[in-house]
Amino acid sequence: MKNQYLPVLLLLSVVTLAQTKDMIPQTVEFPSGTLHLKAYLWKPAGPGPFPAVLFSHGSGGDKADLTAGMQITESADILAPFFIKHGYAFLYPFRRGHGPSADQAPFMQDVLLSEEKEKGRDARLQLQFKLMTTDQIDDVLAALAFLKTVPGIDIHRIAVAGNSFGGQLTLLAAERDSTIRAVVTFAAAAGSLERSAELRDRLIAVVRKTNAAIMLIHAENDYSTAAGRSMAEELERLHKPHSLKIYPKVGLTSDDGHNMLYENIPAWEDDVFKFLDQYIKG
């Protein structure tokens, strides 16, 4: 999918960048098991300690260096200025097989496509669930462990955020690490929840267990908003801190809606940072 709003987003990033200091990311390496993964790290100017957000990208398009129709490194560059502007350090890890970490493992979509061709759609969904709950979440947790060692990071004020498949991983991370204080998901499990009862049950179990505040975001024209609505319903039943935001349609297609994180930053910026400030800085 070609990102039709990318020139505008790049302009917004440039303007924000001009208003912020020290915006060149530090390329860092962290271990995940026997692998050596890469990440981009930004910190606000000053000594800190800073609250921090770890961001999990989606599972990619048809190439290992793409996400949401753009270069995966470019997506990191687009998002980072907004987090820095609001006073948050920002870590963008590249999971195994993706972007600068592509040399550490096969690209997940290639693995899933091969599984589907050989064994069918259901087998692909089962393998995707397995990878989500093993290798992929291991990489996120490894990045989180690394983040806590970075000088100038306040380890008591950490949030996780993610888009699409990465949004699912943020929820799993919050279940596994009780120090995470807030979760923000964009389009998590959109279109996947209806195809996998296993995934649906797992995500509901996650929101029952975690004590982190959870913000669930979709555009109205996402592939589906059922995942956010069902998790919000369970969180409401349990009286846990949460926010569900279903924003108006973005662009013309469901792809546009699914990628509203990048397509319409002005729509979510104030809401997301109000939420993060409440539960991370408050």
Model-derived segments and spans:
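The conserved beta1-alpha1 loop
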Residues: 51, 56-58, 218-219
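The feature captures the conserved acid-bearing segment of alpha/beta-hydrolase catalytic domains
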Residues: 182, 188-243
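Primarily recognizes the serine-hydrolase "nucleophile elbow" in alpha/beta-hydrolase
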Residues: 132-209
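Alpha/beta-hydrolase active-site loop
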Residues: 104, 108-151
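Alpha/beta-hydrolase
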Residues: 56, 93-95, 186, 247
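Short substrate-entry loop that stabilizes the transition state in hydrolases
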Residues: 48-50, 59-102, 192-193, 224-225
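C-terminal catalytic histidine-bearing segment of alpha/beta-hydrolase fold enzymes
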Residues: 241-282
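N-terminal cap/lid segment of alpha/beta-hydrolase-fold proteins
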Residues: 19-48
